[in-house]
Amino acid sequence: NTPLLASRRCGFPPADYANLITVGFGMLSIGIAESAMDAYATAARKSKGGAPSQAENQWVQMETGMLWTQLQAARLFAERVAWLADERSEEAMPAAAESKMLANEVAKQAAAEALRVGGGGSFLLSSPIQRIFRDAQAGALMAYSVPLTQQVVGEAVLAAD
């Protein structure tokens, strides 16, 4: 019972095919993390009042290196999930949950660091960082939430032989 024309209906996916929405959740958070990294780098490169930019500080460089590496790992994991789904592997759905969990945490961390480097101005409505920070928090709450996923993954790991 749908207004969609019969010629446009594609029916239900096969039972062995992964839930494609779940497969894409990790990529959503990766996009947020990439936006956070862009805002982070922009804020770090800004020079205020003739002072050197924060990009010259060792702690900022070290944090940038770790965030970048974590983002690359999360992206590779999400790409693997898409490949598993295309292969109709039974590992696709568990890997999708793990990928979402990792990507959400990377997005939240990158957004938090963007706030830290951006300073108080990051909380203003005119700053893209405040929106990115909210988006990162929301990603961790949408189904399946990070706490639930942590529990499910942890339970599976501890139950393994």
Q: Residue ranges of each PLM-predicted region?
A:
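Generic structural signal for well-ordered, non-transmembrane alpha-helical segments
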Residues: 31, 65, 69-72, 97, ...
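Extended, amphipathic, non-transmembrane alpha-helical segments
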Residues: 42, 74-77, 108-109
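Structured catalytic cores of enzymes that bind and process phosphorylated ligands/cofactors
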Residues: 24, 38, 101-111, 124
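Glycine-rich beta->alpha junctions and the first turn(s) of the following alpha-helix
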Residues: 1-71
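C-terminal helix-coil-helix/basic helical segment that borders enzyme active sites and/or dimer interfaces
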Residues: 72-102, 115-123
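Glycine-rich phosphate/cofactor-binding loops in nucleotide/flavin-utilizing enzymes
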Residues: 120-161
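Hydrophobic packing residues in well-ordered alpha-helices of helical domains and bundles
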Residues: 26, 57, 64-67, 92, ...
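Flexible, glycine/charged-enriched surface loops at secondary-structure junctions
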Residues: 48-54, 89-93, 126
